Amino acid sequence: MLFGKHPFTVVPNGIDTARFAARDPQRRALLRGELGVTDQEILFGHVGRFSDQKNHPGLLKIFAAVRTRLSKARLVLLGGGDPAYVEKMQALAAELGLGDSVIFAGVRSNIQSFYDAMDAFLQPSLFEGLPVVLVEAQTAGLPCFVAETVDRGAAFTDRVKFLPLNDTAAWANTIAAASFRRDPQAREKAIKAGYDIHTSA
C-alpha cells in the first residue's frame, strides 16, 4: 500500500457546488441561442482537453450513432489542445456526416453556464481517475453517460450510466432510451459525498 500502516485521509476534489448547481433559465436560453441550439434540440456536452486520453474519435462515433436515433441531438465540445488535433477531429466530424450538429466551442471561462445549457454529459475517456468535470456535471444535475474506465466512486447521483468503452451501439441505445431530467437534489448529494469546496478543503 502507498502509505503502509500510517493513517491517512482522502480529501475529495472540492468544487463550488452552489455555482454549478445554480439554474438560470434566461442564461440557458441565451447561451443556447448563441450556439444556435433550439429548445426542441437535445444538447449533449463534453468538457476536456483534445488529447488521446479523452477519446474524441470514440465520442464522435458514439454521437453519430446517437444521431441515427435522436435526430434533434447536438453536441458541444469544450476544451483546448493541439490545433492540428482539433482540426483532425473537425475533419472526422465532417466524415461522419455530423455537419453543424457538433459545436467546437474551444476554451471557455464560463463552464458552469455551459452545464446549464446542456441536457446531458458524455465522457468516453480511455482512462480517468476521478474526473472533476464529472463531479461538476453531476452537481449541475445532468444525466451523465460515462465509460466504464472511469472510477465508479465518482458517481454520487443515479443519473450516471457506466457503459462499455468500445460498444458504440450500447451507448447509443442507452442514451436514446434515457430521460433527460435533471436531478433536483444533485447539490445536496454532492455535499453529502464530500465534494463541496467549503467542507472538503
Regions found by a protein language model. Give the residues of each.
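A short helix/loop element that forms part of the nucleotide-sugar donor recognition site in Leloir-type
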Residues: 21-37, 91
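A conserved mid-protein helix/loop that constitutes part of the nucleotide-sugar donor-binding site
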Residues: 42, 46-65, 75, 84-88
